[in-house]
């Protein structure tokens, strides 16, 4: 009798154990399958759709904005000096990054495609969103907070064979301005001076269309050079443009008083079309005087 009771108790315990372990294993298996299924779904279906959506949006924007050979979308970084070959131009583009030159049309994405977006601009923002042209006043340099999308060019390079003189005691500043000028005026001739005391002899032995002057230089300043040039009528046809960090209102008034035609603020983050327009305007005004 006791043996029968004991067997029944053992059987009931065994059944209880099975009933407890069985559903647990099934629930665990179901949860595991659910997790795996949804994690795979999240990774293989949701994320690729997001990437494709962004890619399609960018591709449609590119096709409408970047048209090879279209002069309305000319980039000065695609214009090279006649003496530079394709390999040199590629090296120059790397130098642009080292010198701080920024051009969204030459920014390459991780897929090797040319992008007209600045690395600092979200991909969701269309390029045309900030193409509104700011208003400028005489001797008022464009704000250093200018939207980098404005660097997109709408004009072709100027083929004129202008003669430019750059005077700056900092060789890096000279190289930056020199490269910008060659992009805008590929046929121009540029003379560079780090020693401002040599300017007097240079302007007597060479004819320049525009002299670009740093203001703060040792021994003789850009203001002194401009004042001396304007005191000699022979230099009335020569344009003078200051390239400086000193752009306060009282500084600009002094520059205008001594005969400086225009002022670009450092760093040179201007729209290339704007730079060309200002230089051309200075040259036209000086020729007519």
Curated annotation (Swiss-Prot):
A GO BP term here is: positive regulation of filamentous growth of a population of unicellular organisms in response to biotic stimulus
- Do the record's keywords include Phosphoprotein? yes
Q: Which InterPro entries match?
A: Bact_response_regulator, CheY-like_superfamily, Sig_transdc_resp-reg_receiver
Q: Does the keyword rRNA-binding apply?
A: no
Stretches with biased composition (Acidic residues) = 83-98
What is the role of this chain? Required for stress adaptation, morphogenesis and virulence.
Protein name per the record = Stress response regulator protein 1
Question: Organism source for this protein?
Answer: Scheffersomyces stipitis (strain ATCC 58785 / CBS 6054 / NBRC 10063 / NRRL Y-11545)
From the broadest rank down, the organism's phylogenetic lineage runs: Eukaryota, Fungi, Dikarya, Ascomycota, Saccharomycotina
């Amino acid at each position: 009798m006791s043996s029968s009771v004991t067997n029944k108790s053992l059987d009931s315990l065994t059944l209880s154990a099975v009933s407890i372990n069985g559903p647990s294993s099934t629930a665990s298996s179901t949860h595991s399958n659910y997790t795996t299924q949804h994690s795979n779904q999240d990774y293989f279906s949701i994320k690729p759709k997001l990437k494709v959506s962004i890619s399609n949006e960018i591709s449609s924007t590119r096709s409408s904005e970047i048209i090879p050979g279209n002069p309305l979308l000319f980039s000065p970084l695609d214009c090279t000096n006649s003496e530079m070959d394709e390999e040199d131009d590629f090296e120059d583009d790397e130098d642009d990054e080292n010198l701080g030159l920024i051009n969204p049309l030459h920014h390459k994405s991780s897929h090797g495609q040319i992008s007209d977006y600045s690395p600092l601009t979200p991909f969701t923002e269309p390029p045309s969103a900030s193409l509104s042209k700011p208003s400028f006043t005489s001797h008022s340099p464009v704000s250093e907070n200018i939207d980098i999308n404005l660097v997109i060019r709408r004009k072709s390079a100027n083929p004129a064979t202008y003669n430019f003189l750059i005077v700056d005691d900092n060789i890096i500043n000279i190289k930056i301005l020199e490269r910008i000028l060659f992009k805008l005026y590929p046929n121009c001739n540029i003379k560079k001076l780090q020693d401002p005391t040599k300017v007097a002899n240079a302007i007597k032995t060479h004819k320049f269309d525009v002299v670009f002057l740093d203001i703060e230089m040792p021994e003789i300043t850009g203001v002194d050079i401009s004042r001396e040039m304007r005191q000699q009528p022979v230099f009335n046809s020569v344009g003078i443009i200051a390239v400086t960090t000193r752009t306060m209102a009282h500084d600009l008034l002094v520059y205008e008083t001594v005969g400086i035609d225009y002022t670009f603020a450092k760093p040179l983050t201007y729209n290339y079309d704007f730079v060309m327009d200002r230089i051309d305007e200075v040259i036209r005004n000086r020729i007519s005087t």
